[in-house]
Amino acid sequence: MLVLDEQQQAARDWFESLRDRICAAFEKIEREADSEASFRYTPWEREDAEGGPGGGGVRGQMTGKVFEKVGVNVSTVGGRFAPEFAASIHGAAEDPRFFATGISLVAHMANPHVPAVHMNTRFLTTTKRWFGGGADLNPAIPNPEDTDAFHARLRAACAAHDPTFYPRFSKWAEDYFFLPHRGVARGVGGIFYDHLECFEPGEGPTFEENFAFTRDVGEAFLDIFPKIVRARLRTPFTEDDMSKLLEFRGRYVEFNLLYDRGTLFGLKTGGNIDAILMSLPPLAAWT
């Protein structure tokens, strides 16, 4: 059993609470669409490199009328990084021991006019402590109103903490969520941040400050995405629209399997395979 300190416990509790609220909000949308779909939860455990308890998590997934496939995962894991992987992790080169807790969400929607979405926030401990995460919108058929509303809500969350956050983190998302082999973006962006390091008071941003920002990212997502879904879920669509959706999902698959840091981290740390690949859509197409 993992032994958590006060900061690790607080972060884990927040991610689990946010999961519960997001799942309830998504189930409410399904009820409004005359669907009885609900999340099904599957707990999982992992072993560390020595075969001892290394934490685990809960994978939540729903297949519904509005949400064709949505997964909301929370995990809390710890152990030692493999030597070849430790060198690439902030603060792990000198000591491979780590702790990580976080929430990861991907929603693929039934109506091609409702954008897919990704949200992830996390807290890691190596010889350093930091937060990372973000949220990005992934429409097969972009709608400027949705894009503007999504970015405006994230901009407000960032501005409440640091005026440089949104310019920095939106550019980071623009650069990160990009498929180099195709020369195209994965979606219409959002924010992405990593290595938001926590310092002692007087030495830099504290745990409390960075944790407050990370909570506000989660709150911003919970506020804006259900509004976008409700605005678009009854939009009529054509076979051509569905073809665009399936082709876009193919690009999404390519990014997540080739470039996504979370996928690589999960595979390198003995994470739950079903939870790691939860981000993949139920159907996709390539032409």
Which role fits each region the language model picked out?
Residues 3-90, 201-258:
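Gly/Pro-rich turn-and-neighbor structural signature
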Residues 7, 109-111, 125-127, 137-144, ...:
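A generic structural motif
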Residues 83-85, 114-116, 143-146, 265-267:
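Short helix/loop capping segments that flank catalytic or ligand/cofactor-binding pockets
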Residues 89-91, 121, 150-154, 270-274:
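Short intrinsically disordered coil segments
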Residues 109, 263-287:
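Long, contiguous binding/interaction regions
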Residues 127-169:
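Compact, glycine/acidic-enriched structural inserts
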Residues 157-213, 227-230:
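Long, charged, mostly alpha-helical binding arms that flank functional sites
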